[in-house]
Amino acid sequence: MMNMQNMMRQAQKLQKQMEQSQAELAAMQFVGKSAQDLVQATLTGDKKVVSIDFNPAVVDPEDLETLSDMTVQAINSALEQIDETTKKKLGAFAGKLPF
C-alpha cells in the first residue's frame, strides 16, 4: 500500500500535468461553422470568443433572424469541439488519481 507521502507526491505531479494540459487547451483555437460555412466563430479552449466572421451572402438587413441563428449555430459548434477536446485531454487524469 502506498504511503501518504507517495500519494501526495503523485497527486502534486498529476496537478502540475493537469494545469499544463489546461494551459495548452486554453491556448488552442476552435472554429465552429454554421450551415454552408456562412458564419464562422473562433473561440479559445477556455471558451473566449476570438472572432465571428460572416460571409457577405448571409448579411441581409431584412432577415437578421437567420444571421442570429447561424451565429448561435457556429458558436455552439465551436463549444462542442472544445468540450470534446477537453474530455480527451483532461479525462485521462481521472483514472490516475492515487486515491
Swiss-Prot record:
Record's function text: Binds to DNA and alters its conformation. May be involved in regulation of gene expression, nucleoid organization and DNA protection.
Subcellular localization(s) per the UniProt record: Cytoplasm, Nucleoid
Keyword vocabulary terms for this entry: Cytoplasm, DNA-binding
Annotated PANTHER family: NUCLEOID-ASSOCIATED PROTEIN YBAB
SUPFAM superfamilies from the UniProt entry: YbaB-like
Cystine pairs: none
Protein name listed in UniProt: Nucleoid-associated protein SP_1102
Subunit structure, as described in the record: Homodimer.
Organism for this UniProt entry: Streptococcus pneumoniae serotype 4 (strain ATCC BAA-334 / TIGR4)
Keyword Oxidoreductase in record: no
Pfam families the UniProt entry points to: YbaB_DNA_bd
Presence of the UniProt keyword DNA-binding in the record: yes
Organism phylogeny: Bacteria, Bacillati, Bacillota, Bacilli, Lactobacillales
Family: Belongs to the YbaB/EbfC family.
GO molecular function, one term: DNA binding
Gene3D superfamilies: Nucleoid-associated protein YbaB-like domain
Listed GO CC annotations: bacterial nucleoid; cytosol
